[in-house]
Structure formats: structure tokens, C-alpha cells
Amino acid sequence: MSDTEYLARAEAVLAAVERTVDVANDGDHDIDLERNGSVLTLTFENGSKIIVNLQPPMKEVWIAAKAGGFHYRFIDGEWRDTRTGTEFFSALTEYATQQAGLPITFSA
């Protein structure tokens, strides 16, 4: 994948996360979302955080959550964990739901 393709696909991930948080905040959630360049920080009501950031040199998207640090690479049309193969949005849904204490579903 070229650098241009990576940036387009990775920025789409960040945009999808931002959209989901905006919709969740219209409902029962109160998630603070801060974007600084290619880093998104989600802060939940209990003070816990999830950080999603782009890693252009490696062509990856990373998640840092209470559950740990995870690296995702674009494989066969989806962002997949480099160790487990778990799909990015499925994993983020699990981590955010655990940390928020309320269900929240992320998708592309």
C-alpha cells in the first residue's frame, strides 16, 4: 500500500471513531474527544482513556487502552491486529464498552 493509500484509509478510521463518539454523546454517553494531529484521545466519565493514533512509518493504526496496546495493519480490506487478527472496530467496541461501562459500537 502506498503512503497516500495508507493515509486515506487511516484517516477514515479516525473519522469513523469521531462520528461514533459524536453519536454516542447525543445519547447516554459523555465521552470527551480530543484530536491532536493523528492522535485521538477518548476520555470516559470515570477518567479512563483510550488513545487511537496513526503510525505512518509502519502503516499501522494503534490503540492504547486499559486492556493493553494493540497494533493494526490493513489486511484484506480490514484493519487487523498484527498478533491476534482481531478486527479494529470490533476490538475498539469491546475496549470502549468495558471502559465506559455502557455499550458503544464502533464501525467503519
Swiss-Prot record:
Gene Ontology biological process terms, A to Z: iron-sulfur cluster assembly
InterPro entries xrefs: CyaY (IPR047584), Frataxin/CyaY (IPR002908), Frataxin/CyaY_sf (IPR036524), Frataxin_CS (IPR020895)
Superkingdom to which the source organism belongs: Bacteria
UniProt keyword list: Iron, Metal-binding
GO cellular component terms listed in the entry, alphabetical order: cytosol
One GO MF term attached to the UniProt entry: ferrous iron binding
Gene3D superfamilies hit by this protein: Frataxin/CyaY
PANTHER family, per database record: FRATAXIN, FRATAXIN, MITOCHONDRIAL
Family: Belongs to the frataxin family.
Function of the protein: Involved in iron-sulfur (Fe-S) cluster assembly. May act as a regulator of Fe-S biogenesis.
Protein name from the UniProt record: Iron-sulfur cluster assembly protein CyaY
Organism: Burkholderia cenocepacia (strain HI2424)
Higher taxonomy: Bacteria, Pseudomonadati, Pseudomonadota, Betaproteobacteria, Burkholderiales
